[in-house]
């Protein structure tokens, strides 16, 4: 970061905090934090599993780790990405008869994490990003003043994407 700043440039970082790789220290320490329906094979995308954002311990971990990174360096910009659909909607924290609450609790947990991080760092520009615009909605626009809708840069496709997102 200091080297980039020394060149007169502002530093940006790209996070994908809602995902975890099984080949990571975090997963090895907390495999129960990854969402997986018991008795079924885990659904992986890009060799990742989704963290259970409905859990307060997961939220607290992400808030602490991300804030530590942002507090430690002169970071101007953060891209917050999610590159997969959530498929294994299951929480080890809730009994089977309350699993219908998990996705809603996941989103509430995500809002808490973003509130704690973004409000703590009002001078950092946060940009939302999700594969194919899968998380482009009014609530996300509250957190991200700009949004990267898609990596598709074909001119005709971009016109359609921008037209569609203009309705939000």
Which residues are covered by each model-predicted region?
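Glycan-recognition surfaces
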Residues: 21-60, 104-168
């Amino acid at each position: 970061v200091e080297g980039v700043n020394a060149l007169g440039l502002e530093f940006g970082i790209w996070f994908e905090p809602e995902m975890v790789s099984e080949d990571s220290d975090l997963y090895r320490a907390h495999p129960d934090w990854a969402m997986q329906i018991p008795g079924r094979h885990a659904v992986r995308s890009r060799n990742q599993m989704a963290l259970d954002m409905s859990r307060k311990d997961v939220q607290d971990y992400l808030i602490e780790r991300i804030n530590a990174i942002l507090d430690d360096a002169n970071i101007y910009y953060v891209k917050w990405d999610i590159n997969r659909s959530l498929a294994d909607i299951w929480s080890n924290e809730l009994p089977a008869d309350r699993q219908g609450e998990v996705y809603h609790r996941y989103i509430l947990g995500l809002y808490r994490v973003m509130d704690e991080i973004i409000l703590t760092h009002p001078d950092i520009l946060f940009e939302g990003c999700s594969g194919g615009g899968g998380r482009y909605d009014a609530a996300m626009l509250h957190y991200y003043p700009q949004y990267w809708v898609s990596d598709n840069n074909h001119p005709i496709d971009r016109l359609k994407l921008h037209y569609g997102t203009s309705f939000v």
